[in-house]
């Protein structure tokens, strides 16, 4: 039976679902919350979004603070009463008028003047200067400072007016208004920092913030705790001290005052710390989601750095790591293209060393017929395009049959089967690849004739060269024999020849595609070699897979 969720877990799940900041949700927005929009959003629309978020939260936080202050003055300190022991024009005239005026003017001034002036560079799509970045990062502090000033002015004004009727009101009003003002300012500071993430991200692109403007996670946490919990608790202690000195509350009234202040402190303190934890967790969750994508092989895109604390450094570090991985993959891809995927993989597994090893392998040598005439009679660009089409067919079939293109030499290519990766029957792979190459060349590039030679046997495969520069290559009789067979195949009707020894070592299935022919003595050899060639197919009988047909269509359209 599953455990029953606590109230905190339910509230946390509700907030995470609403803001889409939970790491278990299907995707994590770039700024940590869908409320902040997308990275691609236009500056004008982003400004409207920020203005609405800041306005709504400032209004909500201040109205809540006003209600709480009224409840504290009314129920926590019932004696003297602001309704019966003070002038009515203060309670029902000046206090509501100042609250309304301060809320309207303060909200307008903060959103239209302070916020807009600090992020004007972002609205105008200008690169931020150092001063712009400083003003943007200081904006949450300025918003909180404006709230403290307005609440302190209101507290001083009301304390003075109420104090004319009873001096006890001075302490009560100053205490209640100051405590609520601090809590409201703290909440507005945190939420303004949240709303400004998209603009802060742009500011942080210009460089790391000065340390004095980014107190770090520890500094931010302790500041929020001090303002959200430390100050209210101090207020409770002040209340007790006030009662001890003034003696104007009964035990029941004192208990009620402490209870109300404690509940207020718990609620506001919990809310402030919850928002702080929520904002702190967002960058971590964004990084965690990005790490999951990297784990799955997705290296596209960088994180948006929107936090000025150590979490922003974490985001920068992640971006640096991904950039390094992308560069590594790019170098790996280039290395694999130059030396072959198998050779590159072997070099990654172990440190390359000069030397070689005996291997049983098969070799395929492919060379274009009449390449000199082709180069002399065609423009260079056309020749290069033709060679690329030719080698694309060769590489495709060699890869498909688990071979390795060891090198390109002008208009010729040398392919190895069985090195560096071992194959159970390298002869089968080499013969099948050679047949496929011959078939595709005849069907896809009839204007190009090429000779193909196949031989198998013992070779020496390894790194040859010097310590400063070496390459993986193969040497041995099969290599030379394949080259001689390739020369001979240029004048053979099938354009493809293999040695009988290679054919005998192949499987019965592969041998069924070949026929033994005449015996010749290859140039440079004393022993005769019996030739083998594939069965001749009637014109138009060449079988093409859907993949090859699509490649032909693409080449012709291109």
Curated annotation (Swiss-Prot):
Organism: Mycobacterium tuberculosis (strain CDC 1551 / Oshkosh)
Family listed: Belongs to the adenylyl cyclase class-3 family.
One GO term describing the cellular component: plasma membrane
Highest taxon, organism lineage: Bacteria
Protein name: Uncharacterized protein MT1361
Record-level GO BP terms: cAMP biosynthetic process; intracellular signal transduction
Domain Guanylate cyclase intervals: 362-486
Record domain HAMP: where: 279-330
Region annotation (Disordered) ranges: 529-558
């Amino acid at each position: 039976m599953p455990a029953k969720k606590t109230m905190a877990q339910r509230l946390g799940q509700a907030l995470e679902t609403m803001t889409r900041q939970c790491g278990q949700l299907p995707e994590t927005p770039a700024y940590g919350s869908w409320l902040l929009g997308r990275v691609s959003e236009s500056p004008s629309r982003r400004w409207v979004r920020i203005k609405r978020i800041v306005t709504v939260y400032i209004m909500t936080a201040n109205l809540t603070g006003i209600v709480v202050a009224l409840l504290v003055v009314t129920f926590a300190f019932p004696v003297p009463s602001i309704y019966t022991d003070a002038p009515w024009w203060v309670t029902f005239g000046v206090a509501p008028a100042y609250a309304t005026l301060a809320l309207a003017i303060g909200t307008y001034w903060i959103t239209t003047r302070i916020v807009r002036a600090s992020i004007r560079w972002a609205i105008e799509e200008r690169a931020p200067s150092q001063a712009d970045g400083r003003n943007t990062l200081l904006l949450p502090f300025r918003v909180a400072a404006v709230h403290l000033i307005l609440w302190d002015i209101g507290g001083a004004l009301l304390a003075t007016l109420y104090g004319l009727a009873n001096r006890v009101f001075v302490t009560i009003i100053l205490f209640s208004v100051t405590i609520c003002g601090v809590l409201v300012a703290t909440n507005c500071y945190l939420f303004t920092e949240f709303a400004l993430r998209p603009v802060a991200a742009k500011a942080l692109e210009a460089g790391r913030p000065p340390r004095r403007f980014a107190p770090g996670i520890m500094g931010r946490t302790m500041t929020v705790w001090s303002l959200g919990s430390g100050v209210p608790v101090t207020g409770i202690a002040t209340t007790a001290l006030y009662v001890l000195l003034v003696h104007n509350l009964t035990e029941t009234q004192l208990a009620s005052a402490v209870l109300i202040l404690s509940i207020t402190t718990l609620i506001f303190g919990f809310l402030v710390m919850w928002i702080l934890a929520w904002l702190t967790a967002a960058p971590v969750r964004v990084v965690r989601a990005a790490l999951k994508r990297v784990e799955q092989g997705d290296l596209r895109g960088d994180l948006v750095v929107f936090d000025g604390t150590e979490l922003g450094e974490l985001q920068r570090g992640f971006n640096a790591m991904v950039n390094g991985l992308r560069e590594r993959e790019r170098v790996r891809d280039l290395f694999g293209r130059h030396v072959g995927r198998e050779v590159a993989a072997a070099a990654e597994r172990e440190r390359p060393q000069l030397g070689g090893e005996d291997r049983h392998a098969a070799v395929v040598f492919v060379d274009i017929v009449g390449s000199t005439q082709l180069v002399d009679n065609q423009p260079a660009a056309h020749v290069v395009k033709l060679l690329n089409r030719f080698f694309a067919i060769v590489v495709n079939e060699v890869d498909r049959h688990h071979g390795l293109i060891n090198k390109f030499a002008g208009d010729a290519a040398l392919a190895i089967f069985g090195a560096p990766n071992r194959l159970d029957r390298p002869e089968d792979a080499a013969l099948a690849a050679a047949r496929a190459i011959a078939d595709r060349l005849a069907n896809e590039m009839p204007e190009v004739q090429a000779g193909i030679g196949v031989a198998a046997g013992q070779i020496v495969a390894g790194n040859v060269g010097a310590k400063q520069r070496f390459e993986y290559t193969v040497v041995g009789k099969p290599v030379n024999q394949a080259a001689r067979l390739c020369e001979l195949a240029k004048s053979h009707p099938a354009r493809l020849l293999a040695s009988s020894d290679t054919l005998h070592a192949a499987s019965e299935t592969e041998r069924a595609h070949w026929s033994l022919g005449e015996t010749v003595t290859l140039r440079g050899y004393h022993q005769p070699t019996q030739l083998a060639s594939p069965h001749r197919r009637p014109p138009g009988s060449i079988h093409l897979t859907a993949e090859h047909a699509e490649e032909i269509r693409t080449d012709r359209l291109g």
